[in-house]
A protein has these predicted regions:
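Histidine (H) residue identity feature
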Residues: 6, 16, 70, 84-85, ...
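Catalytic-core segments of nucleotide cyclases and related cyclic-nucleotide turnover enzymes
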Residues: 61-64, 80-117
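Conserved long alpha-helical elements within nucleotide-processing catalytic cores of c-di-GMP signaling
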Residues: 5-31, 41-45, 49-50, 61, ...
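GGDEF/GGEEF active-site signature
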Residues: 25-88
Length: 117
């Protein structure tokens, strides 16, 4: 799960048209490393999710590293909470875990910003 950092500030200072452009550009950034069976979903507001159809924790780790290594190419800073769906687990539980990881990462980045690339 991804959350754009300070997105409200973009809308408030640069206007909603610019905010809409940032959302489209960010979705394109998220799609960059994905294969044909992998999708980007906008969850609402400034939250996005990358959905991997085939559960592969190795692929999840590769994508997480790609996004962190290419963060400077994103149109805006973001926070990332990665997790995978466990068989037998509800989708709601998976989303809640991703959301918890996302907000822990967001708090960490605000305390200790990532170095510029």
């Amino acid at each position: 799960m991804f959350d754009l950092d300070h997105f409200k500030q973009i809308n408030d200072t640069q206007g909603h048209a610019r905010g809409d452009t940032v959302l489209v550009e960010f979705a394109a950034f998220l799609r960059s490393p994905l294969g044909a069976a992998e999708n980007v979903v906008r969850m609402g507001g400034d939250e996005f999710m990358v959905v991997l159809i085939t559960p592969d924790t190795g692929r999840l780790a590769v994508l997480e590293q790609w996004y962190l290594q290419h963060a400077a190419q994103s149109p805006t800073p973001f926070s990332l909470g990665a997790t995978h769906h466990t068989p037998g687990e509800s989708v709601g539980d998976t989303l809640q875990r991703a959301d918890s990881r996302l907000y822990r990462e967001r708090a960490r980045v605000r305390r200790h910003p990532r170095p510029a690339s």
